[in-house]
Each structure stands twice: as structure tokens, then as C-alpha cells.
Amino acid sequence: MFGKTLIRILVCMLAVMAGQNLIAQEPRPSPVQLEAMKKLQFLVGEWKGEGWNEMVPGQRRTSPIAESVQSKLGGMVLLVEGLGKRKVPGTQDEVVVHNALGILSYDERAKVYRLRSHIATGQTTDAEAKFTDGGFQWAFKAGPSLSFRYTVKLTDKGEWFEIGEMSQDGTEWRKFHEMTLQKLK
């Protein structure tokens, strides 16, 4: 009887000590992912400015835009939230014209940046992203014959300059969106 009790006590003690070892060994973030995400730290902060959309040629609509970019999970992801509002003509009312949330990360296995975005209408996109000539670009298909791509560059003044383009054939692109934002903090 005493032997069985002693064995139970020893087993319990070993289980507790093993659990403490697991707790003490916190998982470490991937250095490769952290290094890749450091290249995007220039986006972190609060940004405000103006932008325009022109989905139908000749029908451009301008509005104030704000973007908030936060580093999360110890630098492993960026959380990007954008909001644009425009005054309703003839009133003091505002209507939301841009309301988006994105999660930007680096996929170490595939060696690509990924952007998962959500907009207030419920639509989501999963896009691969990459660095281009002085900018950062992501693109996605919105159907069999419609593609979108966005490019963000930091200007010499330190402004966030972004363009959005659309294509029906993947070779000819038409700019439908542009915004210039100043960093507040």
C-alpha cells in the first residue's frame, strides 16, 4: 500500500515538474519572419490625408482617409485599419466610403508576404505581396477577368503614397485609386 502511494506521489511530482519546464520554455518567434516584417515598420503609426476613387472613368470621388497600422504579436504581423468618410452633398452628414481591416504577415515556408483583408461589406481577399521598385505591392483576382493591385511607397517627404489599379486582362492597368497620407505619430 505504501509503495503504491509513493509511486503515485512520484508520478504526480514528475508531471508537475515537466509542466513547469514546458511553461518556462516560451516559444520564440521566427528570426526570419521578424527580419522580413522589420522591412515594413515604416508603415507603423497613425496616418491621415486625402484620397480618391474612380471606379467608373470620369466619376472621381475624393474623401479624407485615415490609416492606422499597429505592430502585433511581437512584430510578427501588422494590423492595418483604414477609414474614409465623405460629406453628403448639401448636408453635414458623412457617409463611410472606405472601411477596411488587413493583417499583413510573412509566410516563412512559402517565402512570401501575405495580406488578408476584410471590408465592411463582408468581402475578404487573400493576396500575396512583395517589394517592388521603391514600394510594396499586393494584388488579387476579383473574378475570372478582373484583377486589382495596390502599391504603397514612402515619398521623399515621408508621406504614404498609394495607388490602386485594375485590369481586365492582366497586362493593361487603369488607375482607379490614389491617396497621400501624412504620418501623425
Locate the predicted segments by residue.
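N-terminal secretory signal peptides that target proteins for export/translocation
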Residues: 1-5
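Bacterial N-terminal signal peptides
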Residues: 8-19
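Hydrophobic small-molecule pocket/channel-lining residues, especially in calycin-type beta-barrels
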Residues: 24-185
